[in-house]
Curated annotation (Swiss-Prot):
This is Sensor histidine kinase RegB. One of its GO terms (molecular function) is phosphorelay sensor kinase activity. The chain crosses the membrane at residues 26-45, 52-70, 79-96, 104-123, 130-149, 165-182. It comes from Cereibacter sphaeroides (Rhodobacter sphaeroides). Gene3D superfamilies: 1.10.287.130, Histidine kinase-like ATPase, C-terminal domain. Member of the two-component regulatory system RegB/RegA. Involved in the positive regulation of photosynthesis gene expression in response to anaerobiosis. Also involved in positive regulation of the cbbI and cbbII Calvin cycle CO2 fixation operons, as well as in regulation of expression of genes involved in alternative CO2 fixation pathways. Phosphorylates RegA/PrrA. It catalyses: ATP + protein L-histidine = ADP + protein N-phospho-L-histidine. The lineage of its organism: Bacteria, Pseudomonadati, Pseudomonadota, Alphaproteobacteria, Rhodobacterales. The keyword Phosphoprotein applies. Its EC number is 2.7.13.3. InterPro entries: 2C_sensor_his_kinase, HATPase_C_sf, His_kinase_dom, HisK_dim/P_dom, HisK_dim/P_sf, RegB, Sig_transdc_His_kin-like_C. Signal peptide: none annotated. GO terms for cellular component: plasma membrane. Residues 218-445 form the Histidine kinase domain. It is a multi-pass membrane protein.
Length: 462
């Protein structure tokens, strides 16, 4: 898959993802908490607060929420700039409340982390950096300039400067850490979501191709008799019109076109007959079907199929599941792309498992990313090697992820490794020296039960 500027999976395009309703609900929660804190602090704790100014600050949020609720539709999506402005308003309103209520002597100064965390989850990194810098600036301002908290006896509440500095430093570190951490988590979630979408699209495409093949096969079967009739009649006309060359040539053209239609339908429906007998096949045939698009690409593809201890001499008959064929095909494509000359595909079976191994004679996986192979958007081989072996190709790092996801959906376990030490010299490396992928299924997840019915008998009405 190619990452294009207008592609559905373009990860850099994240505008219009957040609904205005979501931020409105969060703001209502903040308003309720602020009102509760102000009332409890003034009425029950006996701290004298400038209630008028405090209620004015909270009222600004209430007015903004009411206007947003009645002016804009509930399903309104926010652009990057609009979301930034809303979060800046909330950050400024909270900082003003801190200015009125003691600055860093107010433990609720910790809430200044909330807008930055939301930005890290929802907005891009530049917006989050801007919001974080403004938050640190406002926090520093309220640390030096604020109205003191006056207790009931008229004394002001103060804390040691060292404690105040420590609280400021803790919040600054929290802004930096939570901003980066929430951003990283959001990227991981979005990457996984995009990759799963790509996987589902690949599986749907494979399923649609299979369904289309079945439709074509049925059409070829239904059109067989009319085409045969056209061919027979045109042949008879050609014989009867032997003395009229012009008309005879027309009859010959009709016969040739009927043959062409037959050949086209036969070739299109060869792989798509939708009967249950064609939904299963020997392990070797299914592997060859998966490898077929990559056999003629200039690399030698060798198959080796054998039973292991306790396995039957005959190849197991397995289901031709689209996710199995497409997943194995992706693994074979990756091996062919990076092999020097040869790809080996081994099939092995026992009484309780089926295993396939795909090995190439390329450079193998970089040791630094072997543990991450199968994660979305990870380039699986060295960049310079990828460009030389796949010129003009700009992948998304989804090939092995799609293969791994599809095969695991079928019940398989995958493992990735290098067949040899990548730091060995050329003459020291064995023939099978590149990347190796092993896929193992339990027998009951893949093998067709012998002597099982192929399907329901069709009721014949007489």
């Amino acid at each position: 898959m190619i990452l294009g500027p207008d592609g559905i999976l373009n990860r850099d395009t994240r505008g219009d993802w957040w609904r205005l309703r979501t931020l409105i609900l969060l703001r209502w929660m903040a308003v309720a908490g602020q009102l509760a804190a102000i009332v409890v602090t003034d009425w029950y704790l006996g701290v004298r607060l400038p209630m008028g100014l405090c209620f004015m600050a909270v009222g600004a949020s209430v007015i903004a929420n009411v206007i947003a609720t009645f002016v804009f539709p509930q399903n309104r999506r926010l652009t990057e700039f609009q979301a930034l402005m809303i979060l800046l308003f909330d950050l400024t309103q909270l900082s003003f409340l801190l200015f009125l209520t003691g600055g860093l002597t107010n433990p609720f100064a910790l809430l200044i982390l909330a807008p930055v965390t939301i930005s890290g989850v929802a907005l891009d990194v530049r917006t989050t950096v801007i919001l974080g810098a403004i938050a640190i600036g406002l926090l520093t301002f309220t640390a030096y300039f604020h109205l003191p908290l006056i207790l009931a006896d008229g004394s002001s509440l103060s804390v040691p400067r060292m404690f105040e500095f420590g609280f400021w430093l803790a919040i600054v570190i929290g802004i930096l850490f939570l901003g980066l951490y929430s951003r990283r988590v959001a990227i991981e979630i979005r990457s996984m979501s995009d990759a799963l979408l790509a996987t589902q699209m690949a599986l749907d495409r494979e399923q649609k191709l299979t369904d289309l093949g079945g439709v074509v096969a049925a059409a070829a079967h239904e059109l067989g008799t009319p085409l045969a009739t056209i061919k027979l009649v045109s042949s008879e006309l050609a014989e009867e019109l032997s003395e009229q060359p012009a008309l005879r040539d027309d009859a010959d053209v009709i016969r040739e076109q009927a043959d062409r239609c037959r050949d086209i339908l036969r070739s299109m429906g060869r792989a798509g007959k939708d009967d249950l007998q064609m939904r299963q096949g020997p392990l070797g045939e299914v592997l060859r079907e998966a490898a077929e698009p990559h056999v003629g690409r200039g690399k030698r593809v060798e198959f080796d199929l054998y039973p292991s201890r306790g396995g039957d001499e005959r190849q197991p008959v397995i289901l031709r599941r689209p996710e199995v064929i497409h997943g194995v095909r992706n693994l074979i494509q990756n091996a062919v792309d990076f092999a020097r000359s040869t790809v080996w595909i081994d099939g092995e079976w026992t009484g309780d498992r089926i295993a396939i191994r795909i090995v190439d004679d390329g450079e193998g996986y970089p040791p630094a990313i072997i543990g991450r192979i199968g994660d979305p958007f990870v380039r699986q081989r060295r960049a310079e090697e990828s460009q030389s072996r796949r010129p003009g190709y700009e992948g998304m790092g989804l090939g092995l992820f799609i293969a791994k996801t599809l095969l695991e959906r079928s019940g398989a376990e995958l493992s990735f490794a290098n067949a040899a030490d990548p730091f060995l010299r050329s003459h020291e490396r064995p023939e099978r020296c590149g990347a190796i992928v092993e896929v193992i299924w339990p027998v009951d997840r893949l093998v067709v039960v012998r002597n099982a019915p192929l399907g329901e008998n069709v009721l014949i009405q007489t």
